[in-house]
Amino acid sequence: MRGRGNARSLLVQAVSLRPATWHPCLDMGHLHRPSSRTSHRNLPHVFLLFLFVGPFNCLASYSRATELLYSLNEGLPAGVLIGSLAEDLRLLPRASGRQNQQLLHPERTASEGNPPLSFSLASGGLSGQYVTLNNRSGELHTSAQEIDREALCLDGGGGAAWAGSTSIASSPSSDSCLLLLDVLVLPQEYFRFVKVKIAIRDINDNAPQFPISEISVWVPENSPVNTRLAIEHPAVDPDVGINGVQTYRLLDYHGMFTLDVEENENGERTPYLIVMGALDRETQDQYVSIIIAEDGGSPPLLGSATLTIGISDINDNCPLFIDSQINVTVYGNATVGTPVATVQAVDRDLGTNAQITYSYSQKVPQETKDLFHLDEVTGVIKLSSKIGGSVLQTHKLTILANGPGCIPAVITALVSIIKVVFRPPEIVPRYIANEVDGVVYLKELEPVNTPIAFFTIRDPEGKYKINCFLDGEGPFRLAPYKPYNNEYLLETTKPMDYEVQSFYEIAVVAWNSEGFHVKRIIKVQLLDDNDNAPVFLQPLIELTIEENNAPNAFLTKLYATDADSGEMGRVSYFLGPDAPSYFSLDSVTGILTVSTQLDREEKEKYRYTVRAVDCGTPPRESVATVALTVLDKNDNSPRFINKDFSFFVPENFPGYGEIGVISVTDADAGRNGWVALSVMNQSDIFVIDTGKGMLRAKVSLDREQQSSYTLWVEAVDGGEPALSSTTKITILLLDINDNPPLVLFPQSNMSYLLVLPSTLPGSPVTEVYAVDKDTGMNAVIAYSIIGRRGPRPESFRIDPKTGNITLEEALLQTDYGLHRLLVKVSDHGYPEPLHSTVMVNLFVNDTVSNESYIESLLRKEPEINIEEKEPQISIEPTHRKVESMSCMPTLVALSVISLGSITLVTGMGIYICLRKGKKHHREDDNLEVQIPLKGKIDLCMRERKPVDISNI
């Protein structure tokens, strides 16, 4: 089958194509024949099968039942191609009804004019919601209804829900999720019933989620190290496979716990809490952390919940008395039921493990037990009978505090009975503040001098002077109330703070002049007020996170305390108005997360406020500042300022001179943004300074050897792994006038050319041909004759632009002989033009009869006066008038021409041959030799290698 892409580059592929089932009415010659052994063994079964299905199958003799399986990702947009039934069933367009003939002879069936194929779903059902079928082409596409695998399969509980021609099927033991369709291929001639199965592949579009936001786990305090406890309510992820929950972790282990994950045979992962240290409930009874579930998608998605680990109590503590002995005084006239003392033991355990009962020791006499009643629950000792005259004055009460499974704690109470012959003073309170069961309730921050109660002091005997004072510590004062001498007012002396001390116990003591006194205990309970705002542990919360973080990445857990109690001390957390929208803060747990990927190059630092608000009325709040720094990752390649660079450099530029700066930047920071430059090609010629980006040439560059260079420069950053980019650099060499013209013809100062006396004025005689390796004006050449030698050398002139030498005047009898022209070839270079010279030898005669004579003349040093006249090149051609000569030379010339016509024709033939020979010499690749004349002119002989001048 063919793979098909989609708009999000998700593979949609038909993974299998089952062959058509065998039909008994098809041509047996084209069927696969089983082996003889198999056919003999299964012959009865095959025969029975023929008898049963043959009649039904023959009703549609050419039908074929076929099954196709495709797969695609969930969440694809509308119009994504799933598969082509016509292609995958190998059905040709406009095929005939006989499929065997169609497949074997398509050219024969195409001409029969059979009706075209058509495809249709067996019935409507749910197919229109998820897929569309093209009735002509047989192409299946996704519809506008987006396919959600979790909604299709997980909601079905692993079964199948059929609706017409479409159904959804899933297996609870696997990750398969199938969309089933029945497709009919018509017309009847090649009818097929096709079962199409579309496997819906899962993508990571769901984050793990815990069923509850707060999970509680109870661990006995005597649990040994490595104890494992399963955490109930594990996270649920509707995705399957690697996209499901893969692992768990704790945000804060407290050094006491860790997590392990176990996978059962069904692939379900359960987190286990493992005890890593010794626990003591009495030291710390609770640990709070954040449990995070993470799936295996890319990028992974996270879910979190608050994990509260409670330490359950065991009976590892016994009751304990703070004191070993107490001393109590009882007046002899005390009434029955008067409290004598209270014993109280402490057990640090909880619940039934801390249940304490009090009892007398067996050493306590029964008479004492009858006199003093001990409450076994509260430990209160009361006078149970009236004190008689014969009662002992001192009683020793040995009291036991009993705990479950413990040795009793022991305390001794020594009770001294004071015989009284008169009645003690009386203290009668009248409460102003709210009082319930002997406890006075005051609001904190009540103003100074807040009245609490009036106390009236009475002397039953009426004959003693009674004094009164306040016993105990606290911001209270007991002062006489002025209008009445025997009344006192209890009031506050300064504002009280619940958070400093919430409970006070004081006593009003009255005594008479005989030394007898009585106490009245006053208990004061402060009521908390919302007078404290939450306080962050740090006013500035500095955080860091690497860029390109996963979505919903954890940043920190905010924590603020409130000294108030109850709801007034419960703190909620909120983002400030200046916080970007992609930051989120859990109001209950204080967990701060970022929902999107951060890019350091877009923004490196974030600074915003967070609020901690209590639940008091009115609520109080405090503000902290979050300073988040995004750490850099090497996610940006170096970037050149220009796509490519071009530099113009004069030739002969000195080695290691500065050609130009290659500017490159890297948006990353630190080492990730450090860029090193290097030349990838021609590094033997060029080098680049990494620090400055300066490009230099190691050697001097000659334009005539190479006019331009193309370099590739690579920029590599210092990240791990390193990122790089390249750019193209073009270096164009600018020409300077460093090459004089090179004379190619004539090739030697010793060569000569025969000029016939019959040559007409204005006729070309020869030429000087030179080239210059420079360019532009440096290569524009001008020709001039700067020296002449011969009978009448001024008879010849040279074209300053072309170098053509022509005869100016008709040759006379006196002009016979050797004419020597010193030609200067100059360029137009700036600032100093360069030049070369060449000697042009012209021998005027009818024939060359003695070459040795001519060569001897050429070997003599000519005495030539140098003319310093510069050649003038004009755009328009110039013409010189040929001055009229005397009649005699003209007549002689005409006579010679008329008498020597044959000689003239012969001379012209020789001239033509010489011209062809010159062209041949120009094309020769031998060494070109320029031989200057010796003599007064300071010339030298130079040899040059042949130069290709085809472009001149």
From Swiss-Prot:
Name of the featured protein: Protocadherin-20
Disulfide bond sites: none
Residues exposed to the Extracellular side: 61-891
Subcellular location: Cell membrane
Keyword Transmembrane appears in the UniProt entry: yes
Gene3D superfamilies listed in its UniProt record: Cadherins
Gene Ontology CC entries for this record: plasma membrane
SUPFAM superfamilies for this protein: Cadherin-like
Function comment: Potential calcium-dependent cell-adhesion protein.
InterPro entries registered for this protein in UniProt: Cadherin-like_dom, Cadherin-like_sf, Cadherin_CS, Protocadherin/Cadherin-CA
PROSITE patterns per record: CADHERIN_1, CADHERIN_2
GO molecular function per UniProt: calcium ion binding
GO biological process: homophilic cell adhesion via plasma membrane adhesion molecules
TM region positions: 892-912
Keyword entries, A-Z: Calcium, Cell adhesion, Cell membrane, Glycoprotein, Membrane, Repeat, Signal, Transmembrane, Transmembrane helix
Segments forming domain Cadherin: 64-210, 211-321, 322-536, 537-640, 641-743, 747-864
Cytoplasmic topological intervals: 913-952
Alphabetical list of CDD domains matching this protein: Cadherin_repeat
Gene this protein is translated from: Pcdh20
Record's signal peptide: 1-60
Glycosylation sites (chain numbering): N135, N327, N333, N681, N749, N804, N845, N850
Keyword Transmembrane helix appears in the UniProt entry: yes
Membrane disposition: Single-pass type I membrane protein
